Structure formats: structure tokens, C-alpha cells
């Protein structure tokens, strides 16, 4: 048995106690890391960083110093890269290729296949054509030859392609795209971007217009009610209770108590009016406190008793009436003061206790929210910083690749300019005048997606006026040979689309075109993402248009 030091034991205990305090922060960091992992899942694994580029440049300098040809080394590297890409493409084709059995005796489910699939689909599967989800076969930009009759679907696919390229290349911090369904507008085909300020302004203007158009609520005015003793009575007022006891000498005690106790001397009509008014004004009256209701009940009982006592005294001795009035008034005033003070004290104490409980609950909630916010701020900021640094690294890598490629092209042009050498200074000036910055060579232009697409498009589509507009817009992206888009950027844009937009044939063709010809994203990765979003089988029936 080995003894554990006391410091290690204390560290273990404190770490166990601190686990439950930061459980919420761990959940937030896990969510942020999951988001970043989803975005960086489809990023190229072998990222050439600055250190590798510097090592490569030093190696090239050493090789040139030894005596090896600089351009020969570059050609060998390019040939090796192309060979590796070709081998990878062949492997993917072999994996996706349909390989039927050679002998019919080995096929056990041949009859089932013939019953479920038609002959054309079997021929296409045997030929090695991969059936993509939601993509049409005949009128498709991915097809090797496009028919001249299908102009409308090709125009819609070109509009969706421009919208997708625009969404992939804009700065999302200041700009945003208009809805995808607006890209098929013949006045503005392909859609356009807009600033966030302008969109918010349009929303506020629309809300104001809707508020202006909607009819205002009509106020229902009630007819003025007939004022009676019961309708004008409000028990919460202090003056009504004071008038209960302080009566003038000339007025009788019965008339002074009629404002509280409903008398039997009133006619039946006044009672009906009183009931109607009380029922109509019941929801408008303020809700009385419990102690005030008890106080009113006590006052009413006292008033009834005094009326009974005074009626008996009037029968027996009318001379004692004035004395009884004074005694009763003084006694009632003192009793009302004591009950009012006690009710006020009890109501204030109960209200203070209730307010203290509410304040304690609100403080605990505020403290809990502050703790959650503070624990989540670090994880959110870390995730944002990681995503920004990742994007900056990708931009740097793309720029370095473009600069290296253009530097190689300029070096070749300079090398070929020294055909006949005469004088060093003359040759240098001749090279500087002749060499111009040319973007791309003949092979790169021939293999580019834009020029390949233009060669496939039918003449009817090129003469179609809305199609001319969309082709002019696509020219901006097509002539940019240095366009680089990462797979995670495509998935981030597609995440904001709705399911019916992803399943639309025209939009699906545009997504497939961008994935295969521009981004070069593996098909398996895209299908896995699409299945997690749309929940469809791997092989879906195509739409014949």
C-alpha cells in the first residue's frame, strides 16, 4: 500500500466539491465545442501551415544551390499531386460503382430487383452512374450534354447557382442574402445581397404600415348610471365611515345610518336599479383588503344594534334620546379608531412580510442568472475566438496557395523570355516589358467549371433575355480563377435553408454543382449531412423532368 500525500487528498476533495459548481459551465462549453466540431468536421485534414511552407521554401533554396532545376522540382511536385488526386478519384469511383454478379446462380434476389426497379435504372446502376437525391437526370447542369428544349429548368438552376455562390462569398457580419425563392424573379434573376441595416429598416416600415392599416379598437361608452345611495357608496373611503357616527343634531339616527344599512323604506324600483348598477359596476370596483371587509361588517352590525336600541328608547323615554346620542357617538368614534389602527398595523406587517419574501426570491433568481451568464461568457467567447482564428487561418492558406501558383507562372514567363541573350541590362528590361500578369494557364482555363458550363449550355438558353442577365452575374465568379470555398462554409449556408428548399430539384442541382466542381467536397460527407437534416434513404428516386 502506498501512502497518498495530504496535499493530493485535499486537491481531490476540492476538485470533487468544485465539480457541481461548474457543471453548467461544462455544459455550455460542450455545446460550443460541438458547434465548432460540426463546422470543422468537413475541413481538409492536411492543412499546410506557415511553418511547412517555410520549410519547403528552404528546401527549394538548398536544392537550387546544389544545382537542381527549380522548375523541374515544381513540375515533379505538381505531377505527384495530380497523380494522388487521380488515384483518390478512382478509389471513390470503385467504391460507388455497381458490380453485379457474373453468374445468375449467385443472384438470390434477382426477381425482387426486377420487380422493384425498372430496366433503365438497372442499366444506369450497371454503368456506374450514382443516383443523387432530388436531382433531375435530363435537364440538369451536371449532365454531359444539355438538350436545347429544356430552357426553363436550366434557367432556374442557374439562378439558384448564382444565389448560392453569392451567399458563400459575402461577409455575413455586414450583409445578408434575400430569400432564396426571390432568385427566380425575372426582373432580378439570381437574387442579390442586402445590408442588415436596410433589412431591419424595411421590417420596421412594414410593421408601422400594418399598424396604420389595422382598424383601431372602438371604445364602448356606457350610459351614465342613476346615482343612488348604494351606487355612490364606496366602503374604502374614510369619509363614509366618519359620517356614520358624526351626525348632526337635527337629523335622526335612522337617516344617518341609511347610507350603510339598506333600509326597507325605499321603493321596489330603486332596489332593482340598485341591483343592476351594482352588477354592472362590480368588475370596476377595487378589491378590498380582508381587514377592511371585517371592519365594514363590524360597523354594519353596530349600526343595526344602535337602531334597535334607539327605537326602544323612543318608545319608553323620548327625553333620554339626546343623552344616548352623545354617548353612542363618542363610543362609536373611539371604537372605530382602535379597530382602524389595529387593521392598519396588521395590513402593514403582512404587506412588509410579503414584499420581503418576493425580494428574496427575485434576488436569488438574479444571482442565479448572473452566475449562468458569467460561466457561459468564457465558453462562448472561446468558441467565437476559435472560429474567427480558424477562418483567418483558412484565408491565409488560400492566399499563400494563390501567391505560390502565380509566382510559379510568372517565373516560367520570365524564364521563357530569355530566348536570345545579348546584354544583361537589355535582357532585364525586355523581360520586364514582355512579362505581364496572366491569371491561369491554358490547362487551368480549360478545366475551369465556368468555361465548361458555357460550352455545354444550348444556344436557345443563351439567347433568352433573363438568362443573359444571370450569365453576366455568373461571369464575376467564373472569371475569378482564385475562388476558394471551404466545405464547412457550404454546410453553414445550407443549414439556414428550409427542408423543402433542400429537396427542390433546381436547388439540389445547384448544390451538387457547387459541391463537385467548385468546392470538391466528398459526396459521402454531403449525403451524411443531408440524411441527418432531411431523414431520407441513401438512394432516392430521381425526378424525370
From Swiss-Prot:
* This protein's UniProt keywords: Coiled coil
User: Low complexity compositional bias: what residue ranges?
Assistant: 238-259
Could you tell me which residues belong to the region Disordered?
A: 224-284
Q: Does the keyword Isomerase apply?
A: no
Q: Which Pfam families match?
A: DUF4698
What does the record list as coiled-coil region(s)?
72-99
Q: Which InterPro entries does this UniProt record tie to the protein? A: DUF4698 (IPR031526)
According to UniProt, the name of this protein is Coiled-coil domain-containing protein 60
The gene name on file is: Ccdc60
Amino acid at each position: 500500500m502506498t501512502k497518498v500525500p495530504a496535499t493530493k487528498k485535499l486537491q481531490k476533495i476540492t476538485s470533487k466539491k468544485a465539480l457541481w459548481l461548474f457543471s453548467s459551465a461544462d455544459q455550455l462549453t460542450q455545446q460550443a465545442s460541438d458547434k465548432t466540431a460540426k463546422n470543422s468536421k468537413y475541413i481538409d485534414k492536411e492543412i499546410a501551415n506557415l511553418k511547412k511552407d517555410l520549410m519547403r521554401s528552404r528546401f527549394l533554396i538548398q536544392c537550387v544551390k546544389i544545382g537542381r532545376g527549380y522548375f523541374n522540382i515544381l513540375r515533379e511536385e505538381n505531377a505527384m499531386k495530380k497523380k494522388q488526386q487521380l488515384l483518390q478519384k478512382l478509389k471513390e469511383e470503385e467504391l460507388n460503382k455497381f458490380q453485379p454478379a457474373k453468374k445468375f446462380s449467385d443472384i438470390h434476389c434477382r426477381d425482387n430487383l426486377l420487380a422493384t426497379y425498372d430496366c433503365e435504372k438497372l442499366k444506369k446502376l450497371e454503368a456506374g452512374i450514382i443516383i443523387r437525391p432530388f436531382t433531375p437526370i435530363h435537364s440538369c447542369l451536371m449532365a454531359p450534354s444539355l438538350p436545347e428544349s429544356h430552357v426553363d429548368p436550366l434557367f432556374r438552376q442557374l439562378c439558384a447557382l448564382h444565389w448560392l455562390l453569392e451567399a458563400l462569398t459575402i461577409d455575413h457580419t455586414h450583409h445578408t442574402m434575400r430569400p432564396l425563392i426571390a432568385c427566380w424573379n425575372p426582373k432580378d434573376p439570381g437574387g442579390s445581397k442586402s445590408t442588415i441595416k436596410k433589412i431591419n429598416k424595411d421590417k420596421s416600415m412594414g410593421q408601422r404600415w400594418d399598424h396604420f392599416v389595422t382598424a383601431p379598437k372602438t371604445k364602448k361608452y356606457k350610459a351614465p348610471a342613476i346615482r343612488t345611495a348604494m351606487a355612490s357608496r364606496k366602503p374604502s373611503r374614510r369619509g363614509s365611515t366618519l359620517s356614520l357616527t358624526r351626525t348632526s343634531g337635527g337629523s335622526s339616527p335612522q337617516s344617518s345610518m341609511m347610507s350603510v344599512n339598506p333600509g326597507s323604506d325605499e321603493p321596489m324600483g330603486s332596489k332593482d336599479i340598485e341591483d343592476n348598477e351594482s352588477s354592472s359596476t362590480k368588475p370596476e370596483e377595487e378589491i378590498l383588503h380582508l381587514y377592511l371587509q371585517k371592519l365594514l361588517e363590524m360597523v354594519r352590525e353596530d349600526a343595526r344594534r344602535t337602531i334597535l336600541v334607539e327605537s326602544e328608547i323612543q318608545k319608553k323615554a323620548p327625553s333620554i334620546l339626546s343623552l344616548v346620542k352623545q354617548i353612542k357617538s363618542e363610543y362609536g368614534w373611539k371604537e372605530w379608531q382602535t379597530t382602524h389602527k389595529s387593521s392598519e398595523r396588521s395590513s402593514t406587517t403582512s404587506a412588509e412580510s410579503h414584499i420581503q419574501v418576493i425580494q428574496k426570491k427575485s434576488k436569488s433568481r438574479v444571482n442565479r442568472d448572473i452566475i449562468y451568464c458569467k460561466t457561459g461568457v468564457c465558453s462562448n467567447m472561446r468558441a467565437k475566438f476559435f472560429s474567427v482564428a480558424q477562418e483567418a487561418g483558412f484565408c491565409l492558406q488560400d492566399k499563400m496557395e494563390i501567391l505560390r501558383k502565380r509566382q510559379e507562372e510568372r517565373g516560367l514567363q520570365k524564364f521563357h523570355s530569355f530566348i536570345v541573350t545579348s546584354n544583361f541590362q537589355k535582357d532585364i528590361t525586355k523581360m520586364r516589358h514582355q512579362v505581364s500578369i496572366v491569371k491561369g494557364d491554358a490547362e487551368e482555363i480549360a478545366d475551369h467549371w465556368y468555361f465548361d458550363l458555357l460550352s455545354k449550355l444550348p444556344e436557345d438558353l443563351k439567347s433568352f433575355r433573363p438568362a443573359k442577365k444571370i450569365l453576366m452575374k455568373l461571369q464575376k465568379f467564373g472569371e475569378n480563377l482564385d475562388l476558394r470555398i471551404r466545405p464547412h462554409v457550404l454546410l453553414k449556408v445550407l443549414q439556414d435553408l428550409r427542408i423543402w428548399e433542400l429537396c427542390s430539384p433546381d436547388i439540389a442541382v445547384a448544390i451538387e454543382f457547387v459541391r463537385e466542381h467548385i468546392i470538391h467536397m466528398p459526396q459521402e460527407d454531403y449525403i451524411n449531412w443531408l440524411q441527418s437534416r432531411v431523414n431520407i434513404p441513401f438512394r432516392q428516386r430521381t425526378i424525370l423532368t
